[in-house]
A protein has these predicted regions:
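Regulatory sensory and allosteric helical modules in signal-transduction proteins
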Residues: 18, 48, 54, 58-64, ...
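Signal-transmission linkers at sensory-effector interfaces
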Residues: 1-31, 170-185
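Signal-transducing coiled-coil/dimerization helices and immediately adjacent hinge/linker segments
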Residues: 166-217
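Glycine-biased flexible loop/turn sites that connect beta-strands or occur in inter-domain linkers
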Residues: 51, 126-127
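A short, aliphatic-rich beta-strand micro-motif
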Residues: 114-123
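Amphipathic alpha-helical "output/dimerization" segments
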Residues: 143-160
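Short beta-strand-to-loop transition segments that serve as allosteric relay/switch motifs
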Residues: 132-141
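Short amphipathic alpha-helical segments
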Residues: 29-42, 76, 180, 199
């Protein structure tokens, strides 16, 4: 069985490979991303804003405001729900009334989440790497279309920042290993029809590696 079994398990494996291929896992503390989440917190007038990358077992925050943690387990992540639908913004007006989150420790504990708005950050193929989210400790009655449009713009900018640089040689090797492992999982579980997409990611990274070698020669 796939690690994230369910109707979309194969696509989740491919999405995780896209996270590796993007190079975002090496972008902790990136100043441009930090400025962007600070801007989001100001514009939405919330105490918490974060860029959350959803990996296999965790969500990780390369940039955030109002959180004193670098990562959490995926099983309590709001953003893990948001990446399931990469073309939609996830809206939670009052987490205490949402059966997905009412017992979540981020809701019942000191973080005290009530309002959550999370827009998927997508790679060039439309796969969600994570989200840009804004969070409040008080519930809200509604969000406006202008709010949604603004968060989409900020999330699109975050994606541009993440995808702009080429993946470094070290991170590329880590990505190649990670994607190769994902291919093995698909083959093991009889999902060979997803291998072509992962193989295309591998080829893109290998072309980068070849360009690096040519520049150095």
């Amino acid at each position: 069985m796939l690690a994230n079994s369910g109707p979309d398990a194969k696509q989740e494996i491919i999405r995780q490979a896209a996270v590796y291929a993007s190079g975002v896992l090496s972008m902790a503390g990136d100043p441009a991303l930090q400025q962007l989440v600070e801007q989001a917190a100001r514009e939405f007038q919330v105490p918490i804003a974060a860029l959350s990358i959803v990996d296999r077992d965790r969500q990780w925050f390369p940039a955030c405001v109002g959180l004193d943690m670098e990562q959490t387990s995926r099983e309590i992540s709001f953003c893990a729900h948001a990446v399931i639908h990469p073309d939609q913004i996830m809206i939670v007006l009052d987490a205490t009334l949402d059966p997905r989150f009412s017992a979540n420790p981020f809701v019942t504990g000191p973080t005290n989440i009530r309002f959550y708005l999370g827009c998927p950050i997508r790679d060039r193929d439309g796969r969600a790497l994570g989200t840009l989210c804004v969070i409040d400790v008080t519930s809200r009655a509604r969000v406006t279309e202008a709010d949604l449009d603004r968060l989409r713009d900020l999330a699109r900018h975050a994606g541009d920042i993440i995808l702009q640089p080429e993946v470094s040689a070290r991170d590329r090797r880590q990505a190649l290993d990670g994607i190769s492992g994902q291919i093995e999982v698909l083959i093991r579980d009889g999902e060979e029809d997803g291998v072509d997409e992962l193989d295309a990611m591998l080829r893109r990274l290998e072309r980068q590696e070849e360009r690096d070698r040519q520049r150095k020669s």
